[in-house]
A protein has these predicted regions:
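N-terminal glycine-/charge-rich "phosphate-binding" loop or analogous flexible N-terminal tail
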Residues: 1-41, 45-46, 160, 164
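Short acidic/histidine-rich motifs immediately flanking catalytic phosphotransfer sites
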Residues: 35-41, 60-63, 190-195, 218-221
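Phosphate/diphosphate ligand-binding glycine-rich loop within oxidoreductases
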Residues: 40-119, 132
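Rossmann-like adenosine-cofactor binding region
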Residues: 47-52, 170-264
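A short helix->loop->beta-strand "cap" motif at the edges of active sites that frequently abuts
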Residues: 59-65, 82-85, 160-161, 219-221, ...
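Phosphate-coordination loops involved in phosphoryl transfer and adenosine-cofactor binding
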Residues: 63, 136-139, 211, 220
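Glycine-rich NAD(P)-binding loop of Rossmann-like domains
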Residues: 115-151, 158
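Conserved small/polar residues in nucleotide/adenosyl-binding loops
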Residues: 271-273
Length: 273
């Protein structure tokens, strides 16, 4: 919280608001409602608790706005909106470092970095490097062309790569403007050297990425997940990584997060968590 809100421009924040920079949880609000009844603005981030409309009206009657220093507000926003409280999200700003991180991993993965870095022996590393195609003319798959997916696509335009996209909701005209080719989910996995997941976070996308897709990946391909861990059938991914020693997985997210103690992800050298 303090890193997000009270770092570079703390003085600006304090000029606008009489800021209390303590960190509170939902239990604090419910146990001492009198301390929060004059609160007009709330600053939160990942882990924002869910309040009912009744709890908001009873404990935060003067609340005007919630500032959420992260992405999606779907989990908690509706009761606040129904009470007339405005909700602001940093979803666009939050997407920038995610897109930058994604592109960096794609470039490194296409060069075989994540495999070769494990070898102190230069000859072995060089032999492994040769199994990877590099970044010139390579196919990269993007699953989900939402805000972050589009950011990644635009940043990849600086490279000579062919970008294949799976997104049923991406208009053909937008795909043409982005210079990408729309294909099926199966084609993304079977034709691309790196597959990067940016699916929307909802019930329909849970478990969408399964073993059949991972098994169809190209030799020495890489799966990169910065979307949501629950969108991957992780038992399938573990099985395929075990059966296919040529594949690599870069997992910025898992489910649960972090993986449970003893998870195979910690033991598979080609899974970077």
């Amino acid at each position: 919280m303090k890193t997000i809100y009270l770092c570079e421009k703390e003085q600006d924040l304090r000029r606008v608001f009489d800021t209390n920079d303590r960190i509170y949880c939902k239990a604090d609000v419910l146990q001492s409602p009198e301390a929060f009844r004059e609160t007009e603005y709330n600053f939160s981030t990942w882990g924002m608790p869910v309040f009912t409309e009744e709890e908001i009206k009873a404990n935060l009657p003067k609340l005007k706005a919630v500032f959420y220093g992260a992405g999606s507000v779907q989990k908690f926003a509706r009761p606040f909106l129904n009470c007339g409280v405005k909700v602001f999200s940093a979803w666009a700003a939050n997407g920038v470092p995610v897109a930058e991180y994604t592109v960096a991993q794609i470039v490194l993965a296409n060069k075989g970095f994540f495999r070769a870095m494990r070898y102190a022996d230069r000859a072995k590393a060089t032999e492994l490097f040769r199994k990877y195609p590099g970044n010139y003319g390579v196919k990269v798959g993007i699953i989900g062309a939402g805000m972050i997916g589009k950011m990644v696509i635009r940043k990849l335009q600086d490279y000579c790569m062919e970008v294949l996209v799976f997104d049923p909701f991406l208009p053909d005209v937008t795909a043409a403007e982005l210079g990408v080719k729309k294909v099926s989910l199966e084609e993304v996995f079977s034709r691309c050297q790196v597959v990067s997941n940016h699916l929307a976070n909802n019930e329909q996308t849970k478990g969408m990425l399964h073993g059949g897709l991972f098994s169809a990946m190209l030799p020495y391909a890489t799966f990169l997940n910065t979307g949501r861990g629950a969108q991957v059938v992780e038992a399938d991914l573990i099985r395929v990584l075990t059966d296919r020693p040529d594949l690599t997985a870069i997992l910025d997210v898992t489910f649960p997060e972090p993986p449970e103690e003893g998870s195979p992800f910690y033991k598979i050298g080609r899974a970077h968590v």
